[in-house]
């Protein structure tokens, strides 16, 4: 148990240097300690879908939960609370007091690189999901850090871009999830975003930080994103408590100089130090492990499997193709995702998982008597798959000198694969600013033939196989998108190899500062990184032909493909909505021979184009499903779980249909949020544009009936007695299942332009076959309100409001109405 300390006593007795030290991290993950006064260091940890601990490189394995959009697709408060509890327990096992999550930025564009981390395109759904997972996490004693406040909705030039957004859109869309969290969850910490809002970086923007503390009366610790502090004076005076990570770049001695010039008040330093101490005192109560450990328990696996299965959205099921009967004799599994599951996106979401269940293994388990045919059909990777199971006796040696000089070995680390990220790695005597490393290992291919090798690096790297240079990614480099946008493109080499023969692999690596490449708008964490991948060289046409052959002879075919961490990651945005090259052609070719018995399973965190959707009878959206990806998908495909997921974002047929199409990247250092409040379904409905699948859509293996008239009581809205909408819902189908009833509010007679309707409530109800239940959804004052830019306040406008209850944004099944008799204004939560 950490000894307690008295905040007032500490502040009254510590030195000025101690106060200043508290205002920045001590290293990559920890706050400063003051041992003399029993003030301990607090450990923070990523990420949005699992708890990595303190090491990007050679980290302790962890539970990997489904990605943010997957969790949002459950529309299930209770499940999100349980997910939060699991994340909290994982933090405790990693010795971490503070979880750097959840992410609640908005998916204004389907191309956003971190779109998979957030819950939804709708601010109400996003806020409620965030509230639930935060309350779960903080019930364990771990502090949650909701992020990124605000406007980090795309990755392009994220540190430099000026997001130009109207006050109304800012309040109604982008701040609203944070406001819900502030009102209902009160998490202990808030992380600022990298970007500017309307001309000034959020981290040093008093108007933005005052909204949190003055408008919402929420007083969390406010920390910067990593290397997201840009000034000393402005950030401190605006209200930034903690600069992360350490060692400091803008505080320390710079604060002393600013205080001497009376540009920062002594009272400001004391105020910020008090907030850090309040955070430390609260966080230190968490019963964290002394060491970083794992906790891979059966009940956690079961929960993760439930989360994955309940997130899966049945997009299309013509002729009840699904579920596939377990009596099937021969089934074809096609797609590179079948054996290599996409369990998470990239960037801060990256971690070393306890395990990952592939769809192939799950199908073998579910169908012990079936003949299973497998073909990759087409590769979905952007970078060649990392070498792991065919690698042995691999280590990395670290030096302060390059290979051509006499050098001293400083450290040796064992590795299990050929990818490493060294941003937070250190060793005694290592010069973090400039060092070199050599990875050596033994590679034993399982197939003879010509092998492709791909090497991507942040720094410099050269690949040797049996001392023959195969790839040079050091002398000439081309910028790519890997490693938070700092890496090179993948350089490819080839070598003829024999199955079963062992080859010596050697990578000569130079740290980040050995690279001549520089970039604007990306975060330079230092250290460097490399990714070596390999696979047997294949003829794309032959791969498709092999897939078509097995599909033609199988009773059922599952094509499982999509995106992965190569395509969706922190550090870059997608250039388009397309699936990887060759995937659409593969799917179309399979449908040519087996459309009546083929189901397409897509794994992605955000929408992809589906030019073949009209031909497919069955389409399943499986997101990034975490450790239990394969089990979760199989549970739905074979009917062990009745799908209940609903899309948390609209699915456009074409990226050009999206309202952000002309404004989704930094141009001249700024990005215009020209769609204003018309994000996602709000836009598509306002302009009457069809989508491939609407917001809130998701099918079931059973059917439901909802009473067509919603009872709304009281009929007159008042702040003392807000109305509730009640309907009867009945499971009229053959099996138990869940339906999510979505409450939308329309203000058809408003004098102010408003969306056709907006989500302001939902509930998920589980019913046995034949069961009927009365379901109520509460309506709060924000359901009738918009941000009045003239008055600079919320405005609840008098008039009649329609209550529309749907099973998606386009399937309205029940209606009612109420009225507001008097216009009201207010600020706050």
UniProtKB/Swiss-Prot annotation:
Segments crossing the lipid bilayer: none
Entry's localization field: Secreted
Major site of localization recorded for this protein: secreted
GO cellular component: a single term: extracellular region
Keyword field: Carbohydrate metabolism, Cellulose degradation, Glycoprotein, Glycosidase, Hydrolase, Polysaccharide degradation, Secreted
Catalytic activity: Hydrolysis of terminal, non-reducing beta-D-glucosyl residues with release of beta-D-glucose
Segment forming the signal sequence: none
E.C. no: 3.2.1.21
Glycosylation sites: 13, 304, 473, 602, 627, 664
PA14 domain ranges (all copies): 389-548
Function comment: Beta-glucosidases are one of a number of cellulolytic enzymes involved in the degradation of cellulosic biomass. Catalyzes the last step releasing glucose from the inhibitory cellobiose.
Stated family: Belongs to the glycosyl hydrolase 3 family.
Name of the protein described by the UniProt record: Probable beta-glucosidase H
